[in-house]
Amino acid sequence: MQLIPAIDLKDGRCVRLRQGRMDDETVFSDDPVAMAGRWVAAGTRRLHLVDLNGAVAGKPVNAEIIHRIATRYPDLRIQVGGGIRDLDTIRGYREAGVDDLIIGTQAVRRPEFVTEACQAFPGHIIVGLDARDGRVATDGWEQVSEVRAVDLARRFEAAGVNAIVFTDIGRDGMMKGVNIEATRELARAITIPVIASGGVSSLEDVRALCAAAGDGISGAIVGRALYEGSLDLAEAQGLADELCGVKP
């Protein structure tokens, strides 16, 4: 069970939103590269970067900062989402040292693009399913489709997707706990590993996620709880390793 710190980028700064609302942000740092260093020093094995401006614009906006983080920490596994709409964007990030690219909006609009990306970059493609009341949202969460997250996830079973990041928008940034029921339901419905996102805020959430690891939940993205200090990364990862039987 990997706990993955999130760095959300908006206008060049590290921010956290509430329920994905671009007008409800808290700025935690003007130096995202230094923030990445903070999580590296805390022992993280992986980092989740989101270009919030890019998610709305449909193309990379904060790519230069992401490139700097990837260059500064070449041994860190980095996954990036936000504005990933074509193969050239994926190629640019891969050449910059980014490990995994998260396809969200295009997974809804052009599911075949996910297959194309997996064929071009095998082992490096993640699908991001961001759901509000079970329905997948797109365009930086500004639009909610009629597509059910579980139904869309099943379409990618044979595509070669590395993982699915499942975000419960209603929990994101609200510090109300992870929606373990919905995440577990999705994980049980597919064979692709699921990374939970949205609401992880306490050691109790970590325990609940570890209890569901056998259902296919392989990790969890953590944001506001780390920034506000309600969750200590080293302590939480240590607990996850202990509960999941990982040796130090």
Swiss-Prot record:
An example Gene Ontology molecular-function term: 1-(5-phosphoribosyl)-5-[(5-phosphoribosylamino)methylideneamino]imidazole-4-carboxamide isomerase activity
Family of this protein: Belongs to the HisA/HisF family.
Cellular compartments annotated: Cytoplasm
Cellular component terms per the entry's GO annotation: cytoplasm
UniProt entry tagged with the keyword Nuclease: no
Pathway: Amino-acid biosynthesis; L-histidine biosynthesis; L-histidine from 5-phospho-alpha-D-ribose 1-diphosphate: step 4/9
Organism of origin: Alkalilimnicola ehrlichii (strain ATCC BAA-1101 / DSM 17681 / MLHE-1)
Gene3D superfamilies: Aldolase class I
Keyword Isomerase carried by entry: yes
Gene designation: hisA
GO biological process, one term: L-histidine biosynthetic process
Catalytic activity as recorded in UniProt: 1-(5-phospho-beta-D-ribosyl)-5-[(5-phospho-beta-D-ribosylamino)methylideneamino]imidazole-4-carboxamide = 5-[(5-phospho-1-deoxy-D-ribulos-1-ylimino)methylamino]-1-(5-phospho-beta-D-ribosyl)imidazole-4-carboxamide
Catalytic site: D8, D130
UniProt keyword terms in alphabetical order: Amino-acid biosynthesis, Cytoplasm, Histidine biosynthesis, Isomerase
EC number: 5.3.1.16
The protein's name in its UniProt record: 1-(5-phosphoribosyl)-5-[(5-phosphoribosylamino)methylideneamino] imidazole-4-carboxamide isomerase
InterPro entries reported in the protein's UniProt record: Aldolase_TIM (IPR013785), His_biosynth (IPR006062), HisA_bact_arch (IPR006063), Isoase_HisA-like (IPR044524), Isoase_HisA-like_bact (IPR023016), RibuloseP-bd_barrel (IPR011060)
